[in-house]
Amino acid sequence: MYQTTAALRSAFLEYFRTNGHQVVDSSSLVPANDPTLLFTNAGMNQFKDVFLGADKRSYSRATSSQRCVRAGGKHNDLDNVGYTARHHTFFEMLGNFSFGDYFKEEAIHFAWTFLTEELKLPKERLCVTIYDTDDEAFEIWNKKIGVAAENIIRIGDNKGAAYASDNFWQMGDTGPCGPCSEIFYDHGDHIWGGRPGTPEEDGDRFIEIWNIVFMQYNRQADGEMKPLPKPSVDTGMGIERIAAIMQGVHSNYEIDIFQALIKKAAAILGVTDLENKSLRVIADHIRSCAFLIADGVMPSNEGRGYVLRRIIRRAVRHGNKLGATESFFYKLVPTLIEVMGADAAKGLQETQAIVEKSLKAEEEQFARTLERGLGILDAALNELATNVLDGETAFKLYDTYGFPVDLTADVCRERDITVDEAGFEVAMAAQRSRAQAAGQFETDYNEGLIIDEQSGFTGYTDLNNQATVTAIFKAGESVDSIVAGDDVVIVLDNTPFYGESGGQCGDEGVLIADGIEFTVTDTQKYGQAIGHIGRVATGTVKVGQVVTANVDKKLRHRTELNHSVTHLLHAALRQVLGTHVSQKGSLVDPERLRFDFSHFEGVKAHELKEVEELVNTQIRRNHELTAEVMDIETAKEKGAMALFGEKYDSEVRVVTMGDFSIELCGGTHVGRTGDIGLFKITSEGGIAAGIRRIEAVTGAAAMAYVAKQQAQLEEAAALLKGDSASVVAKLKAQLDKTKLLEKELSQLKDKLAAATSADLAGEAVDVNGVKVLVKKLEGVDAGALRGLQDELKQKLQSGIVVLAIAGEDKVNMIVGVTKDLTGKVKAGELVASIAVQVGGKGGGRPDMAQAGGSQPENLDAALEQVIPWISAKLA
């Protein structure tokens, strides 16, 4: 019964569907519009706004099987993955949810019935925990369900603070939270461990399988617990844990999904020991990596992309440990798709090619430095006098060889060695400061402003209408009236102003009434409300006041041009580059558009030209734009593209442009594509690994851009004494002439260096029997230094050469050591000792090294130290 994980997933969802729950698809691993989360890490993440009362759904009961990742931030299981039976970077969370519908009694009943009647788990194998003061939950378990009192365990605040308990659940430092009740399964007395709340609770005998959270509060940044609008329920059951029970095994790695991946990895790598922990690591990591890429995350050096990179590189290192000599990780994707089941792997199957290509590219990139880095780490570990690796070495491995510190710690752990993480953090301080400045993950949620009011939007057809002020917020607090000079957010019962979303900026304009003018500088969405952000210019505005809302027509029109063309651009990119292209972000305002999309290489010039021409062709065809509302399943059947990071309701708005483009979109658009006039790409480049960005202009702005380009072309033609038609030919001739002159100049420099070296060689001094030349040069180009030191070494035959040039604000230097002396004096060490005195750094080979510096005023003093330094080495 339910012997596969896929069958178990289906049974769970069907059970709750028959009990009145809406089956909701798993959301993306990248939380939509939630800067407080790195990754989706619980089933309730996609319902956060519902619990907060900021989002309304057509259903009050839901169930889902949510893909989750815990490998960064507060919820980080990466270090333990592969070494324990139940830690994973990726897992599926089965859950049922009540949004102000049922509460404790029904939630407990649903869970108990599913486990004991549907799955037929023996009741004597189950025990439950509750929050210490939750007497209501105790009564339900004991009196209504019939669980004996001794099998109901109260857990208090056991983590050193109020509400800090295993039985008080919270998603993060802020957000929905509440007491919870957990159901545990007893794997039997042949496994060590004790019941929850005992000293032996960390053993593997009693395993939590279901957590039922009674969502009652919204935790604020200051720790205050504010009651949620309606008590709700959030539950979670890890599918891997319940699958292990149903399949009669103890470790999650023994269930069907992991066994298939482990066996495939073993076959690829030629490994026969299926119990090898490295195989577990690889089997776990392919799940998180593949699904993260499928959800739009690409390997990079910051944010989510860096977490993905860390996981991939950890898997590759374990493959290397098992003897991998070529790329292997990406080859597991087909097996993963097969074993996950059609429903769970649908998104992965659609992006299989891009996932495999991205994994292979990252693996090949890391392979170029992996062996060398491991060699350096191995040498450092062999030389250790203690069981702690210094932070400086860990940082060097990170900075030079791309080793995430947890990968270094992973290698060290296998030899019972720890990493000096404090030392590593000191070395990383500069990089961390830059990352923090980027401010990727903020702690505020919706800027703390939760508005209960709802606003109707009339802006698809009207740019002005009368409306009633339903709420005013000043400095985050609700107020009844405001006066001239006040900066506030005004909410209307209906409005033509578009609230920023989907990449389209919020409208600007004015709200007016007798003696009143309110300047709107931005418009934002707050749940179901549309907030008009701005300042009172004149008069007093009160809640209940009737005003006329006027959108700035010119700004709106220019924004619509840019928004509509992003749809054409998206379709054109997919047609020219391939269907793997998907939108990763956009910015649309009155001045320009910015469009981010997935692609594995720079867009070639001819491809960019083809995209631009294709978009302009669709503009000239003057397609009519149509917008219609339909249920999301119908929209998908029509081929409408959904955009990365966006949340959609059960009913969606579909915007169609002829037979060329169809997308889900709530934004505003032109009436016909011909209204756009002209589309001109101004730049294309990479912003992260696998993510490209196009910036462009439309309409009058595009015409102005073309006119400016034409003016610059004519100016260039005049400088070249020709016309615009001859610019390329004349410029090519000029470049050829310049190249020839540069060659002649280089030859003259070489002759000068040879002549100079003959004079300089005679200035060498004897230091302990070795000829040493230390010289600060005047009037010599930095590019001639290398050739000059080569000439001098040849003339000296055996000796050391130190040459330096001082500019206004910089120093260039080179050190040459003849081969017979490198055993005693190394050029890299010598140049580094000089460079540090002039505010620089450098390095190179034992026989030749270069350096630069930013303190020319210290050069003379630094050069005076060279001969004593060499003398000490030779002694």
UniProtKB/Swiss-Prot annotation:
SUPFAM superfamilies (UniProt xref): Class II aaRS and biotin synthetases, Putative anticodon-binding domain of alanyl-tRNA synthetase (AlaRS), ThrRS/AlaRS common domain, Translation proteins
InterPro entries: aa-tRNA-synth_II/BPL/LPL, Ala-tRNA-lgiase_IIc, Ala-tRNA-ligase_IIc_anticod-bd, Ala-tRNA-synth_IIc_core, Ala-tRNA-synth_IIc_N, Ala-tRNA_ligase, Ala_tRNA_ligase_euk/bac, DHHA1_dom
Catalytic activity as recorded in UniProt: tRNA(Ala) + L-alanine + ATP = L-alanyl-tRNA(Ala) + AMP + diphosphate
Cofactor stoichiometry and binding remark: Binds 1 zinc ion per subunit.
Record's subcellular location: Cytoplasm
Enzyme class per UniProt: ligase
Principal subcellular localisation of the protein: cytoplasm
Any one GO BP annotation for this protein: negative regulation of DNA-templated transcription
Pfam families in the cross-refs: DHHA1 (PF02272), tRNA-synt_2c (PF01411), tRNA_SAD (PF07973)
Keywords from the UniProt entry: Aminoacyl-tRNA synthetase, ATP-binding, Cytoplasm, Ligase, Metal-binding, Nucleotide-binding, Protein biosynthesis, RNA-binding, tRNA-binding, Zinc
SMART domains: tRNA_SAD (SM00863)
A single GO cellular-component term on record: cytosol
GO molecular function, one term: tRNA binding
Binding locations of Zn(2+): 563, 567, 665, 669
Keyword Cytoplasm: yes
KW Signal (keyword) present: no
Cofactor(s) essential for the protein: Zn(2+)
Task of the protein: Catalyzes the attachment of alanine to tRNA(Ala) in a two-step reaction: alanine is first activated by ATP to form Ala-AMP and then transferred to the acceptor end of tRNA(Ala). Also edits incorrectly charged Ser-tRNA(Ala) and Gly-tRNA(Ala) via its editing domain.
Family: Belongs to the class-II aminoacyl-tRNA synthetase family.
Domain notes: Consists of three domains; the N-terminal catalytic domain, the editing domain and the C-terminal C-Ala domain. The editing domain removes incorrectly charged amino acids, while the C-Ala domain, along with tRNA(Ala), serves as a bridge to cooperatively bring together the editing and aminoacylation centers thus stimulating deacylation of misacylated tRNAs.
Protein name (Swiss-Prot/TrEMBL): Alanine--tRNA ligase
Gene (name only): alaS
